[in-house]
Regions:
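Compositionally biased, intrinsically disordered low-complexity segments enriched in Pro/Arg/Gln/His
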Residues: 182-185
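PLP-dependent amino-acid enzyme catalytic core
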Residues: 1-179, 189-252
């Protein structure tokens, strides 16, 4: 009756537009044909899959870094080859990433030749060697997240929000691993252009920022306008027939 769609992170109609800004970032940061590194704060793995799609479309990508918070099922799987979903998910400061079993993980596993069902059971193992070649993942605790926010502010006067701090620290974890393998010092860096992604504005976390920094972040104009708008909502019970009737009436 109604042309409805869900724009959640397993909808390919969301992943395809997300893949575009990886090309845009590379066009601004890397030379033509030069590989780039992306560090993407990850929960349900939709944004990260946008980077995988971009790579599949031909974008030269050196490494896709997949930092997670305390919901560390993926880095354990990537490192040890055993997947154990986390249920219930663990609460962390980077709350948009509190996902114990990423719904896009099955899609990633399929890209590397494996098969995983919706419960997380693996029917066929992916090519883990290829995944480790292309991907890096580490788990960033709330303690490390807070320390990163302070460190980046002190060093660069750049205010990160928790998800961006997870991405920043994940990038540094990868650099340390790369330098250890090459036997070089951390100050030398990876030698590749890199884009570190954020998912929100620090103003969405005023209490946490004030605890860490002693002051509240500035609220951007667009957010100020939204905050002044009146709330408009209806309450519905968990009843499909009533929900269906509500939609039909609302959009008649």
């Amino acid at each position: 009756h109604l042309p409805l769609s869900s724009a959640n992170s397993i909808n390919i109609g969301r992943l395809l537009p997300q893949s575009v800004y990886y090309f845009y970032a590379a066009s601004r940061l890397a030379k033509p044909g030069e590989p780039i590194v992306f560090s993407i704060p990850s929960g349900n793995f939709g944004d990260m899959m946008g980077a995988v799609v971009a790579r599949q479309m031909g974008l030269p990508v050196k490494k896709i870094i997949v930092p997670v918070n305390d919901n560390d099922a993926f880095p354990k799987f990537l490192g040890g080859g055993v997947y154990q979903k986390i249920s219930p998910s663990r609460n962390s400061l980077s709350n948009a990433m509190n996902v114990g079993h990423p719904s896009n993980l099955a899609r990633l596993v399929a890209v590397y030749g494996g098969q995983m069902d919706e419960t997380g059971r693996i029917g066929r193992m992916p090519d883990l060697a290829a995944m480790r070649r292309d991907l890096f993942s580490s788990s960033i605790s709330d303690e490390r997240t807070r320390a990163t926010i302070k460190e980046v502010w002190d060093k660069y006067k750049l205010l990160l929000e928790p998800h961006g701090a997870v991405a920043w620290r994940g990038f540094l974890d990868w650099e340390e691993t790369e330098n250890a393998e090459r036997g070089t010092r951390s100050a030398e860096g990876s030698g590749f252009p890199a884009a570190i992604l954020e998912t929100a504005n620090p103003a969405k976390f005023p209490e946490e920022i004030e605890k860490m920094m002693g002051w509240s972040p500035d609220i951007p104009p667009a957010m100020e306008i939204t905050n002044k708008l009146p709330e408009d909502f209806d309450r519905l019970g968990a009843d499909y027939d009533k929900f269906k009737a509500y939609l039909l009436q609302k959009h008649a």
